[in-house]
């Protein structure tokens, strides 16, 4: 989901 994209760690 989008949260995963924002936290590219």
From Swiss-Prot:
Main location: secreted
Record's GO cellular component terms: extracellular region
Domain of life: Eukaryota
Record keywords, A-Z: Adaptive immunity, Blood coagulation, Coiled coil, Disulfide bond, Hemostasis, Immunity, Innate immunity, Secreted
Compartments, as annotated in UniProt: Secreted
GO biological process: adaptive immune response; blood coagulation; innate immune response
The record's account of how the chain is modified after translation: Conversion of fibrinogen to fibrin is triggered by thrombin, which cleaves fibrinopeptides A and B from alpha and beta chains, and thus exposes the N-terminal polymerization sites responsible for the formation of the soft clot.
Function of the protein: Cleaved by the protease thrombin to yield monomers which, together with fibrinogen alpha (FGA) and fibrinogen gamma (FGG), polymerize to form an insoluble fibrin matrix. Fibrin has a major function in hemostasis as one of the primary components of blood clots. In addition, functions during the early stages of wound repair to stabilize the lesion and guide cell migration during re-epithelialization. Was originally thought to be essential for platelet aggregation, based on in vitro studies using anticoagulated blood.
Description of how the protein assembles with itself and partners: Heterohexamer; disulfide linked. Contains 2 sets of 3 non-identical chains (alpha, beta and gamma). The 2 heterotrimers are in head to head conformation with the N-termini in a small central domain.
Domain notes: A long coiled coil structure formed by 3 polypeptide chains connects the central nodule to the C-terminal domains (distal nodules). The long C-terminal ends of the alpha chains fold back, contributing a fourth strand to the coiled coil structure.
Protein name: Fibrinogen beta chain
Organism taxonomic ancestry: Eukaryota, Metazoa, Chordata, Craniata, Vertebrata
Gene symbol of the encoding locus: FGB
């Amino acid at each position: 989901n989008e949260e995963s994209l924002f936290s590219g760690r």
